[in-house]
Amino acid sequence: MVMATTLFLLAGLAEIGGGYLIWLWLRDGKPVYLGLFGAVALALYGVIATFQAFPSFGRVYAAYGGVFIFLAVLWGWWIDGKAPDTYDWIGAVICLVGVGIMLWAPRP
């Protein structure tokens, strides 16, 4: 469980960070090297996910989607300075509950 959580966090940071760097380059007129670093981070995101021990690609990526939502709320708060409201937190927590059910519910 610790390894799965760590990999989800690393993948999330790579995806959100990479997307953010590309956003800064294309939307905010920042230097092109930020876009290139963003592209590398996005490629790393794709690689990091392959280290998950779960056998199903679909389940891993669906569960990761819930982690991504939670991390995106935190990123918006900590990096962009946009405080989440109550509904953002409720939605993010619901997503994390879904992740737990998808990955760790007992299966036959």
UniProtKB/Swiss-Prot annotation:
It comes from Halalkalibacterium halodurans (strain ATCC BAA-125 / DSM 18197 / FERM 7344 / JCM 9153 / C-125). Keywords: Cell membrane, Membrane, Transmembrane, Transmembrane helix. GO terms for cellular component: plasma membrane. Belongs to the UPF0060 family. The chain crosses the membrane at residues 6-26, 31-51, 60-80, 86-106. This is UPF0060 membrane protein BH2744. It is found in: Cell membrane. It is a multi-pass membrane protein. Its main location: membrane. It comes from the Bacteria. HAMAP family: UPF0060. InterPro entries: UPF0060.
